[in-house]
Amino acid sequence: KDSLIVVSGGMDSITLLYEYADRIALAVSFDYGANHNHKEIPFARIHCERLKIKHIVIPLAFMKEYFRSSLLDGSDSVPEGHYADENMKSTVVPFRNGIMLSIACGIAESNGLKQVLIANHGGDHAIYPDCRSEFIQAMDKAMRSGTYENIGIFAPYTDISKTEIASRGKKLNLN
């Protein structure tokens, strides 16, 4: 096993966890104060235990203090609507994936692992700049350039829909 996965505990990352469990040595969740962290991180832990994958939680409390996003402001602040709607921009936590991938990369290299898995997907692109293919490619290049072991990103959901991820999850008997 040569990989680390960034796992929130949501549908996308849990599906990725199961789909590539045979490659994953370590799972990392980040507690950055998002409204959903207290629900999703325990799911991540449960699924990692089921798969016998070591799971760690990295606290990023500073993000809630210094970053602005409705995801950090309490559930009443989060707008409802479609991903592409303008009002959904308030849910962006600036450079969240960049921060998490940077930390995950350092942890991966420190543990002799070769790649970092992340479950960003096509539906995220409309609103989250750090989920777009261009960002993932640039971050992959930066990580490879900045590590002795050429640590890369594996993001197989980048160009597929959430519906497709749900279909994959269903095939894996995830509900």
Residues of each region from the PLM?
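Nucleotide-activated chemistry modules centered on ATP-dependent adenylation/adenylyltransferase
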Residues: 1-175
